[in-house]
Design a protein with these regions (language model features):
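Short loop/turn motifs that recur once per blade in beta-propeller domains
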Residues: 11-24, 84-92, 117, 134-147
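Beta-propeller and closely related beta-sheet repeat lectin domains
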Residues: 25-29, 93-98, 148-156
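Asp-box/WD-like beta-propeller blade repeats and closely related beta-sheet repeat scaffolds
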Residues: 1-33, 44
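Loop/turn-rich, solvent-exposed surfaces of beta-rich toroidal or solenoidal domains
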Residues: 111-113, 146-174
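Short coil/turn segments that connect the beta-strands within blades of beta-propeller domains
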Residues: 33-34, 106-107, 162-163
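Beta-propeller blade signature
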Residues: 1-5, 50-73, 122-136
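Short, conserved, GDST-rich strand-edge loop motifs in beta-rich repeat architectures
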Residues: 1, 39-59, 113-125, 168-174
Length: 174
């Protein structure tokens, strides 16, 4: 902040690293303890074309990518890279990743809806919970609104031990 206020360069405060493992659009990044979670998304190469002409290729990751980031010295690095693959429940992009405190006190995330189902241009209607132990599809719940990425606020009620999520819009199927 002081660099901005004083009109100095902010470049010394930024670091970056590149890697094919992270070439994802439409996914979300979360962190549980010291592990980062890159959830869902797709690899998109080419020019976007809403008419479906062959100007691009896209490949859904169908994954939760887990890794650690080391910020030592002047270079970033990552380690302990692993993946969880599920082409059914983790085929999500352009969704909301919601930070959660589950009823047992475990911290994690919930994938809220997202697009597109493998055999149709429809959103997923059920969420997927993620913890450090793995993931759980909640197929008994249907989310009919806010299927696409949007602004949101996740609120924890410590008295009643409940999470609440407020979506500020978001495209919907219904």
């Amino acid at each position: 902040i002081n660099a901005i206020i004083e009109g100095n360069s902010i470049l010394p405060f930024f670091k970056q690293i590149t890697g094919e493992n992270f070439a994802v659009t439409g996914g979300q990044l979360g962190k549980i303890d010291d592990i980062f979670y890159l959830v869902g998304g797709q690899r998109f190469d080419g020019r976007y074309n809403p008419m479906g002409n062959p100007t691009y290729t896209q490949t859904y990751s169908d994954q939760i990518k887990k890794f650690r980031i080391s910020n030592q010295g002047s270079q970033l690095s990552y380690s302990d890279f692993s993946t969880i693959v599920d082409p059914i429940h983790l085929r999500r992009r352009d969704y909301n990743l919601l930070p959660q405190i589950f009823t047992d006190g475990t911290k994690g995330y919930t994938i809220s809806s997202g697009v597109f189902q493998p055999d149709s241009d429809l959103p997923f209607l059920y969420p997927v919970d993620i913890t450090s132990e793995g993931y759980t599809p909640i197929t008994t719940f249907n989310q009919y609104l806010s299927n696409y990425h949007s602004a949101k606020s996740c609120l924890y009620d410590s008295i009643n031990n409940r999470m609440h999520t407020l979506f500020f819009g978001g495209m919907s199927l219904y």
